[in-house]
């Protein structure tokens, strides 16, 4: 009978020899695994950071919980009645104007213009400066990139020449949907923008939309509760 100590294991020599012979193949596999792990880890970290920044933006920019539009401006008494439903109502008017962003004489897009926002749906300035004069405007960054419009350029909106002083992102327009029923957002032919109160008023009320935003006094715990609260408020 042969003892365990005297028994020779052929793998002791075979495995090192095979590893050395196929070293290049194993090195490629090892590097591929390291690269894959690094890529996935980086993606998860970046994704977590983006979600955290997105969630924090709701408080930082006081993003609305919902919006509605009326045919006429609401009077103070109507707003007071609505606010008895434990919400805060904000006027968030805008005008929607035809625009020739390359000034070639043809209308190529529509810009939804808001006056300065300080209380709700605040704006993030990503490049340039805030508008200070009536003929100055800050437009959405994606729209500007897609249409090759830069800070300092001039666009024509409803016959008015407006200087682009900055590129912005509106907190309630994380994607440029002109209508909630749209299936695809359009950052080429549609943009949102900010002007001074004085500049906004130069467009008059021909294309004025009486839009209102609301925020809850007590925030819903989750999306299900938020949906129910919105449905109850809009009844």
Where is each model-derived feature located?
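Membrane transport/envelope proteins' first extracytoplasmic loop
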Residues: 2-235
């Amino acid at each position: 009978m042969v003892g365990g100590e005297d028994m020779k294991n052929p793998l002791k020599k075979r495995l090192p020899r095979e590893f050395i012979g196929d070293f290049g193949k194993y090195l490629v596999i090892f590097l591929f695994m390291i690269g894959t792990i690094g890529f996935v880890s980086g993606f998860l970290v970046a994704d977590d950071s983006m979600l955290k920044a997105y969630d924090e933006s709701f408080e930082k920019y006081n993003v609305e919980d919902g919006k509605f539009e009326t045919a006429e401006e609401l009077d103070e008494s109507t707003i007071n009645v609505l606010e008895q439903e434990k919400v805060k109502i904000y006027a968030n008017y805008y005008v929607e104007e035809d625009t020739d962003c390359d000034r070639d004489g043809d209308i190529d897009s529509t810009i939804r213009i808001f006056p300065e926002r300080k209380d709700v749906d605040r704006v993030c300035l990503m490049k340039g400066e805030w508008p200070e004069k009536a003929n100055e405007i800050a437009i959405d960054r994606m729209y500007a990139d897609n249409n090759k419009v830069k800070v300092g350029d001039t666009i024509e909106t409803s016959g008015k020449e407006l200087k682009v002083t900055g590129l912005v992102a509106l907190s309630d327009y994380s994607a440029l949907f002109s209508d909630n029923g749209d299936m695809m957002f359009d950052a080429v032919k549609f943009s949102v923008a900010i002007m001074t109160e004085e500049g906004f008023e130069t467009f008059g009320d021909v294309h004025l939309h009486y839009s209102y935003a609301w925020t809850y006094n007590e925030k819903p715990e989750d999306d299900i509760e938020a949906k129910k609260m919105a449905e109850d408020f809009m009844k």
